[in-house]
């Protein structure tokens, strides 16, 4: 990328950012959150226009390929799309070594891009935990890798002055109490018995994992829920869960993906008028899927990302860029390259 192009991108970004801040001050993009405590805790987030989400875990091992067959869609949906039984998928833990994982290198790449916050995975749809939970053996510390990913990354983020949050999926294809499964469910191939499963007991498991995350890993800026769509907010005890989270860390931000209003809207596409009446962010990926795809060659150009960033800023929102480290624990070269290029534009 030429220096002239980089300069034009930086000018565009700064001009649009100034315009977006002016629009916000005039009440153009969204109404202010009325509660004073909510205003206080989200103040820093309103100023941050650009975040990164890491999509990584056990699903990076197959990398969208199962038994030699390539599957489309996000890499963290490989178990669903390939219809892999829970026990067969769990056997992947014996192969999880991530020899190239280096939290300092990850943090440097994030800083190179000029991002203001980072979302780290704690538990994805497959139920695999990237922290040392005492409530399950299906976790990263029980693999040959043996290290507490979330501990190392959270410590590194604080040392490098990077605000961070954790991604947590309600959907869990591994936990025996998570429902539905079996016939007449989205996963008819999951033949584990359901007569002893108890969804309320599963939600208690979620609450206890919230306690682990919010009492053992220091201050966390954002709790990024996902995967709540198979149950109603009442079935997920959403209000109770958020109250529990607020009791543990009153200043934490929570998105709206439990089906109840949170501090901000987490969107998957660019909003049109009327714009959301609360703070919002839009998620995109550096390629055509979320997470690591072993056969991927279709990468977005940095110019496309900066255009999306500028558009989000102009509308009063944030861009959340999703990236997928590979099974070795390293950022693929196209990811590192584009993060640096984006950083040249934003600076």
Model regions and ranges:
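Bacterial N-terminal signal peptides
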Residues: 14-28
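N-terminal secretory signal peptides that target proteins for export/translocation
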Residues: 1-11
């Amino acid at each position: 990328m030429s220096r002239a192009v980089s300069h034009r991108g930086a000018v565009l970004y700064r001009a649009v950012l100034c315009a977006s801040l002016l629009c916000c001050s005039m009440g153009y993009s969204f109404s202010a959150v009325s509660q004073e405590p909510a205003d206080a805790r989200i103040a820093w987030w309103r100023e941050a226009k650009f975040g990164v989400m890491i999509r990584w875990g056990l699903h990076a091992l197959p990398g969208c390929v199962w038994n030699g067959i390539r599957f489309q869609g996000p890499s963290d949906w490989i178990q669903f799309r390939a219809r892999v039984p829970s026990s067969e998928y769990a056997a992947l833990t014996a192969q999880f070594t991530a020899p190239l994982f280096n939290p300092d290198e990850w943090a440097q790449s994030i800083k190179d891009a000029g991002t203001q916050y980072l979302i780290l995975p704690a538990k994805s749809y497959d139920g695999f935990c990237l922290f040392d939970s005492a409530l399950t053996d299906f976790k990263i510390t029980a693999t040959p890798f043996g290290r507490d990913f979330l501990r190392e990354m959270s410590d590194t983020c604080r040392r490098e002055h990077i605000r961070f949050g954790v991604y947590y999926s309600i959907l869990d294809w591994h936990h025996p109490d998570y429902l539905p499964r079996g016939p007449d469910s989205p996963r008819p191939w999951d033949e584990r018995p359901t007569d002893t499963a108890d969804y309320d007991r599963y939600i208690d498991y979620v609450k206890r994992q919230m306690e682990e995350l919010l009492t053992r890993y220091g201050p966390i800026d954002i709790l990024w829920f996902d995967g709540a769509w198979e149950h109603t907010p009442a079935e997920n005890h959403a209000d109770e869960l958020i109250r529990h989270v607020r009791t543990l860390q009153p200043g934490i931000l929570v998105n709206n993906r439990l089906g109840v209003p949170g501090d901000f809207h987490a969107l998957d596409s660019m909003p049109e008028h009327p714009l959301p009446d609360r703070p919002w962010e839009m998620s995109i990926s550096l390629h055509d899927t979320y997470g690591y795809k072993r056969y991927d060659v279709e990468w977005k150009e940095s110019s496309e990302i900066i255009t999306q960033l500028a558009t989000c800023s102009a509308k009063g929102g944030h861009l959340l860029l999703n990236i997928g480290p590979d099974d070795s624990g390293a950022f693929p070269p196209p990811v590192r390259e584009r993060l640096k290029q984006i950083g040249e534009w934003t600076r």
